[in-house]
C-alpha cells in the first residue's frame, strides 16, 4: 500500500476550520476584513459563508487568517516530544 502524502500546513488548517465550522476573520492584502466560515477550498481559493451569503476569495489576495476561537490542531509540545 502506498504511503499517505503529508498535507501541508495551509491545507491542514483550512480543513480543520472547515470541518469544525470555526468562525474566521480573513484580512486581505488591501486591508479589507471578511468574516465567516470556510465551506470549501482548493489550491487557489476559499469559499467563505456568512449570513446565508457566500464569497469566493482568491488565496493570493489573503494576508492573514485569524480564527474566532482558540484551535488545537496538533498535540501539545510535551506530548509530541514524548512520541
Swiss-Prot record:
It holds the Pfam family Hfq. PROSITE patterns: SM. GO terms for molecular function: RNA binding. SUPFAM superfamilies: Sm-like ribonucleoproteins. GO terms for cellular component: cytosol. PANTHER family: RNA-BINDING PROTEIN HFQ. This is RNA-binding protein Hfq.
Amino acid at each position: 500500500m502506498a504511503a499517505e502524502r503529508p498535507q501541508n500546513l495551509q491545507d491542514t488548517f483550512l480543513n480543520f476550520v472547515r470541518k469544525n465550522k470555526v468562525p474566521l476573520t480573513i484580512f486581505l492584502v488591501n486591508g479589507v476584513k471578511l468574516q465567516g466560515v470556510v465551506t470549501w477550498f482548493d489550491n487557489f481559493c476559499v469559499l467563505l459563508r456568512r449570513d446565508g451569503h457566500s464569497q469566493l476569495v482568491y488565496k493570493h489576495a489573503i494576508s492573514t487568517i485569524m480564527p474566532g476561537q482558540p484551535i488545537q490542531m496538533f498535540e501539545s509540545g510535551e506530548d509530541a516530544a514524548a512520541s
